[in-house]
From Swiss-Prot:
Task performed by this protein: Can catalyze the hydrolysis of ATP in the presence of single-stranded DNA, the ATP-dependent uptake of single-stranded DNA by duplex DNA, and the ATP-dependent hybridization of homologous single-stranded DNAs. It interacts with LexA causing its activation and leading to its autocatalytic cleavage.
PROSITE patterns with a match to the protein in the record: RECA_1, RECA_2, RECA_3
Organism lineage: Bacteria, Bacillati, Actinomycetota, Actinomycetes, Mycobacteriales
Keyword DNA damage recorded: yes
InterPro entries documented for this protein: AAA+_ATPase (IPR003593), DNA_recomb/repair_RecA (IPR013765), DNA_recomb/repair_RecA_CS (IPR020584), P-loop_NTPase (IPR027417), RecA-like_C (IPR049261), RecA-like_N (IPR049428), RecA_ATP-bd (IPR020588), RecA_C_sf (IPR023400)
Protein's name according to its UniProt entry: Protein RecA
Coiled-coil stretches noted in the UniProt entry, renumbered to this chain: none
Domain of life of the organism encoding this protein: Bacteria
Gene: recA
Amino acid sequence: MAPQAYDRDKALELALAQVEKSFGKGAVMRLGEEARQPISVIPTGSIALDVALGIGGLPRGRIVEIYGPESSGKTTVALHAVANAQAAGGVAAFIDAEHALDPDYARKLGVDTDALLVSQPDTGEQALEIADMLVRSGAIDIIVIDSVAALVPRAEIEGEMGDSHVGLQARLMSQALRKMTSALNNSGTTAIFINQLREKIGVMFGSPETTTGGKALKFYASVRLDVRRIETLKDGSDAVGNRTRVKVVKNKVSPPFKQAEFDILYGQGISKEGSLIDMGVEQGFIRKSGSWYTYEGDQLGQGKENARKFLLENTDVRDEIEKKIKEKLGIGADLTAEDAAEVPADF
């Protein structure tokens, strides 16, 4: 005979009390007991990308994968996130497995290189062990691993050049991500894995492109960003930067498949002013008539480059436009408790 309802309720309460005693308060909770907290984020440096992500930046306590072709802007996007985390008083770490971090370029993007924790590990195991220890300290706000392709297993480094090491890196990544996921959530650390593209042989239909390191990262990542260079920006005949498109191919904190376009200027990184002009025109705050840009009746300049220079020199106007865009779209630091209740916890 089935137990009565009150017997089941009593058994459940006893089980919950035992779980709480063994694993601590909050180990199990009813989802409706507390109001949902807004998802804390780290801005990316491009307001267009923050909007595409749906919550105003990269989610804290989650894994983010940034991948794309060579020289597409992957590390630039990651370094801007590092700079923004540091600007908010956070501590950042950079695992430079490629041994290719340029401190001068990072400094130009706003990164405090004196405070940045940098490691250049010898093996993939060492890199991921260092990352795991830093995350478990609870003192790191953002950690970047550059790149997954450079996380070479110890057996491969110590072996001969022609030796076969099938699946070693994939197993290494799978084990590391299993360990790190809960630690990231508990510490509120954002882990950015930069990844490279490879081509699968013999693919007849669909895209032959794939990322390195097996499938584990695809599953564990809450956000996956596909970064592509779509155009070269020129000043006369001189190349001054790239037009970059980022597609949010996976997003567990907001609806996916949105995309953003912004300018990356050589030696300067993401053009915040250029991104604000694009979003300002799109949202109706900036008016574009021919090649002229105007804001509330005042001319910003003829051509996007002149308008960008105007905003660079007049930071009060730039900040005002940014505030209006964020308020209209409900992203960033101005998110209210009412807005937060509508933010989905997981997609």
